[in-house]
Swiss-Prot record:
Enzyme class: transferase
Underlying gene: thrB
Enzyme nomenclature, EC number: 2.7.1.39
Name assigned to this protein: Homoserine kinase
Species this chain originates from: Pseudomonas aeruginosa (strain LESB58)
GO biological process: threonine biosynthetic process
Keyword ATP-binding part of the UniProt annotation: yes
Lineage, uppermost ranks: Bacteria, Pseudomonadati, Pseudomonadota, Gammaproteobacteria, Pseudomonadales
Keyword vocabulary terms for this entry: Amino-acid biosynthesis, ATP-binding, Kinase, Nucleotide-binding, Threonine biosynthesis, Transferase
Pathway: Amino-acid biosynthesis; L-threonine biosynthesis; L-threonine from L-aspartate: step 4/5
Listed Pfam families: APH (PF01636)
Amino acid sequence: MSVFTPLERSTLEAFLAPYDLGRLRDFRGIAEGSENSNFFVSLEHGEFVLTLVERGPVQDLPFFIELLDVLHEDGLPVPYALRTRDGEALRRLEGKPALLQPRLAGRHERQPNAHHCQEVGDLLGHLHAATRGRILERPSDRGLPWMLEQGANLAPRLPEQARALLAPALAEIAALDAERPALPRANLHADLFRDNVLFDGPHLAGLIDFYNACSGWMLYDLAITLNDWCSNTDGSLDPARARALLAAYANRRPFTALEAEHWPSMLRVACVRFWLSRLIAAEAFAGQDVLIHDPAEFEMRLAQRQNVEIHLPFAL
């Protein structure tokens, strides 16, 4: 189970008291998390999720709270931070920054179809539309410079075939980092995977885990999302799912010609980002009782993205 900081019941009860949500009925750790400690918390007045933030600078946490408030106010199904009776949203528990949020209904969709991807495309378009007019600035701590640094560090330890795949991808990232094209920007979720979306029947009911959120190119966020939701087990893209996601997104925000030009490379960049972070996690947590996602999944996806046949619709 990926709970890095276990909790005693009495400690949790004392922490929850200022929210005035009634007595604690039950709580349990959430196994799916791979970076933070998360708990389902059942109180007299409802169901909640408690997050202890294990990674990232504490000074960034007000950004996440403000972003979730903005998205909640715009009607997106997100888990905004609850306040105590004194108005506190960000607190500390067992020495870690802690947030209490409503628990959203629904379940993860492990085998999405075109309808699910359409819903996800519309959601991401809504998220970008809600923030592009007033972007809350926060550079990603796993952006292009991070990819270049970590790629260079990891490459010598990779098998020859993997190094041969990574080297041209890093060269492409270096060129993109130097160019910094004027692609449209907004706030990004930057981790919109299947395990961060909840469906209640056929309807999308929630978007969770914003702890990689940042500001940046909307196209990059779209590439991250499509790479997970529309990939087959061999890493190739499923045309029906991909076109459904892109069309729904484009209904919220039409694409530009510059975005169409950079689309294939952005899909590759998004693969590299998660291939590297998974390789790092696999080394750091080897032998520990922590959920580790398979790095090979994104190695396969990067190999499949060398030729991209799914283009952006309605590019102007």
